[in-house]
């Protein structure tokens, strides 16, 4: 996000995070702050007095055993509102939620049609409700729900996908071509920026999914990655033995192994198709800058430059 803002000519940028930026040249814009520390957050926001805000901070992961493990997604959102109310220059704020406010495979009928199946998803649902309950604000808000963002600077699971294809041990599960809405990271950042700059009446109080406009066929995507990496052909594994391995993973997780590589929940996510209507985003944002093939090429280039492939 900072890289795009710099290219667009912005110089007054503040990045609040508990961790330093992974890109060293962005360190000058970083202030260490925990969004759960309301006093510190108010101090930073008041001092900077921003006009445009993108709230990305979150506690992620699906394995935590209690809702309160995701306080950043609930208390953190409320704290951000309390801090922004003290900054008179604020005009707009974008709050980042998740597609997991609904279980995988469920396409909601409207913005508040919630159906979470994990504590993480529930925490994001609560975060959205905190946004929607705000009254008498001097700035507008927008909610975004990113969908499976991948690309440079990414981590699991998509970076591991590139590595496994390169090393020749990736197998496609089952015989089907699973179609999914996915978001290449530079397209996602571009879309968020465009939402910040869009006419107010098109974005105020609205919810947008963030992804590429066209869904990806996961098998075709894997083949394209393999072709660009000059890797071996990708083969299919029958579904039944994979289900057995997932059941073993369930057993191991029940015995205390939290990060089991494969379990039934993860297998279901792999096999579930979800394609979202991206026309509301496209109507506001317009054409996105990169195709799927270009995104793959740019990701491979970044991985090689950073010695991660």
Listing of model-derived features with the role each one plays in the protein:
Residues 1-52, 127:
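N-terminal Rossmann/SDR dinucleotide-binding element
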Residues 35-72, 86, 104-108:
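NAD(P)H-binding glycine-rich loop region in Rossmannoid oxidoreductase-like domains
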Residues 79-119, 142:
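Conserved Rossmann-fold NAD(P)-dependent oxidoreductase catalytic core, especially the SDR/UDP-sugar
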Residues 117-145:
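Active-site Tyr-X1-5-Lys
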Residues 154-160, 174-197, 205-206:
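Substrate-positioning beta->alpha
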Residues 185, 223, 245-288:
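Conserved C-terminal active-site "lid" loop/helix of NAD(P)H-dependent oxidoreductases
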Residues 198-261, 293-300, 309:
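Mid/C-terminal beta-alpha module of Rossmann-like enzyme folds, strongest
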């Amino acid at each position: 996000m900072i890289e795009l803002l710099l290219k667009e000519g912005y110089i007054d940028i503040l990045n609040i995070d508990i961790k330093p930026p992974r890109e060293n040249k962005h360190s000058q814009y970083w202030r260490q702050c925990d969004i759960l520390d309301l006093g510190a957050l108010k101090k930073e926001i008041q001092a900077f007095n921003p006009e445009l805000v993108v709230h990305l901070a979150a506690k992620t992961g699906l394995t935590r055993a209690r809702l309160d493990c995701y306080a950043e997604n609930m208390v953190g959102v409320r704290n951000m509102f309390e801090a922004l109310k003290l900054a008179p220059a604020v005009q707009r704020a974008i709050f980042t939620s998740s597609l997991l406010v609904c279980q995988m495979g469920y396409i909601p009928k409207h913005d508040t049609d919630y159906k979470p199946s994990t504590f993480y998803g529930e925490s994001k649902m609560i975060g959205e409700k905190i946004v929607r309950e705000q009254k008498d604000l001097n700035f507008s808000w927008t909610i975004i729900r990113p969908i499976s963002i991948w690309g440079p600077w990414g981590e699991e699971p998509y970076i591991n996908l590139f590595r496994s294809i390169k090393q020749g041990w990736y197998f496609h599960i089952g015989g089907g071509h699973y179609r999914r809405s996915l978001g290449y990271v530079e397209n996602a950042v571009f879309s968020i920026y465009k939402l910040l700059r869009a006419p107010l009446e098109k974005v105020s109080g609205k919810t947008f999914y963030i992804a590429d406009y066209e869904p990806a066929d996961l098998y075709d995507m894997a083949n394209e990655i393999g072709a660009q990496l000059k890797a071996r052909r990708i083969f299919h594994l029958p579904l039944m033995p994979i289900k057995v391995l997932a059941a073993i993973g369930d057993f191991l997780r029940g015995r205390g192994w939290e990060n089991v590589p494969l379990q039934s929940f993860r297998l279901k996510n792999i096999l579930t198709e979800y394609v979202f209507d991206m026309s509301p985003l496209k109507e506001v944002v317009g054409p996105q800058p990169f195709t799927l093939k270009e995104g793959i090429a740019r990701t491979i280039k970044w991985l090689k430059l950073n010695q991660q492939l």
